[in-house]
């Protein structure tokens, strides 16, 4: 197993990565929550972290470099058809906000998967506005 850590601006670094050289790309790119007029918590409205969605070029680069790709918020981008969408069902969790579920596009040839486990490690507070629970990421 070879692991290489690269420090840099991902938008610049991705351009130099050879096609299909990354075993798994799991990403949650900005999809322009403000530009979609989504309901936002007051604390998020004052931040510009998600002002502009990822461009088609950036999404295509993600698709090019990954062998297996998972794109959270994939329903906001122009992506190829997929049989295997991941669905994070958030309805039953009192502390969740915004949507009842979150969708992730994948290039995996499998059936749709629905994640319903409790996000147990979210009680300690978030360090990122779109943070995913650890058990959800393990499930990916």
Locate the predicted segments by residue:
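Class I S-adenosyl-L-methionine-dependent methyltransferase catalytic core
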Residues: 1-139
């Amino acid at each position: 197993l070879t692991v290489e850590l690269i420090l840099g601006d991902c938008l610049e670094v991705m351009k130099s990565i050879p096609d299909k050289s990354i075993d798994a790309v799991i990403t949650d790119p900005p999809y322009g929550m403000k530009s979609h007029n989504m309901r936002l918590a007051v604390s998020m409205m004052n931040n510009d972290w998600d002002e502009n969605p990822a461009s088609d070029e950036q999404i295509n680069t993600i698709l090019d470099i990954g062998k297996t790709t998972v794109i959270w918020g994939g329903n906001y981008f122009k992506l190829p058809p997929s049989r295997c969408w991941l669905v994070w069902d958030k309805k039953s969790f009192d502390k969740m906000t915004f949507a009842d579920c979150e969708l992730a596009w994948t290039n995996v040839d499998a059936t749709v998967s629905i994640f319903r486990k409790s996000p147990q490690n979210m009680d300690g507070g978030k360090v990122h506005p779109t943070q995913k629970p650890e058990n959800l990421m393990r499930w990916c």
